[in-house]
């Protein structure tokens, strides 16, 4: 059983959802980003998505685009992102880490080398937003063969004809993008999310995590009552963007994480 499977199974037995947190690797700089990464589990993050900076983040909204630019300007590379995971694993061997991003940097790095180094670093899963299931052989197949989960995105526009193909080789969990559009867009209604989760459950037994547009403990709690996981990203990135110092960035992210974690943990308490 993978680290991701263990974490979702464990928290299901505890009767609560999983808090999945997203930050961009190297934003606003390597050292600060690493401190945030290392601090997230103690602040309540159950799974961490680590964004791999890329020069053309087409699926991301302004907040994450700017985070990517800050990271790239600070010298962040794919190799440094893998190094960051390795440094995290020195002290934490239990919190799952999922790398999220685009295929181009991986292709340039070399798929075989990337998969090998990601596994060695302690990466648990991949979300590659621009690599459809028709191209599984390029990355999903070698990643899963090495024990790295390959997580697919589904959206409100993924119809019943397409859904089985998207989910066929998915592993780890399913990431439901609750709002069609770029990251950081407005949030979906609970009625919409309820219907979407029910539809997904007819097609898969994998845990379902819901993201895009969740910014507050109240919103996180509402989704945690419905889904197996709650994904928050842009709200953390905004804390880094508005911070006046590295210390303020770290504190802002971890304080928000603790508040969101409390919302998720108390969501199903009667």
Swiss-Prot record:
A Pfam family this chain is assigned to: Trp_syntA
Gene Ontology molecular function: any one: tryptophan synthase activity
Keywords for the protein's UniProt record, in alphabetical order: Amino-acid biosynthesis, Aromatic amino acid biosynthesis, Lyase, Tryptophan biosynthesis
Pathway given in the UniProt record: Amino-acid biosynthesis; L-tryptophan biosynthesis; L-tryptophan from chorismate: step 5/5
Coiled coil segments of this chain: none
Catalytic activity: (1S,2R)-1-C-(indol-3-yl)glycerol 3-phosphate + L-serine = D-glyceraldehyde 3-phosphate + L-tryptophan + H2O
Record-listed E.C. numbers: 4.2.1.20
Active site: 49, 60
Enzyme class name: lyase
GO cellular component terms given for this protein: cytosol
HAMAP family from the UniProt entry: Trp_synth_alpha
Subunit annotation: Tetramer of two alpha and two beta chains.
Stated role: The alpha subunit is responsible for the aldol cleavage of indoleglycerol phosphate to indole and glyceraldehyde 3-phosphate.
Similarity comment text for this entry: Belongs to the TrpA family.
Protein's name in the database: Tryptophan synthase alpha chain
Species: Pseudomonas syringae pv. tomato (strain ATCC BAA-871 / DC3000)
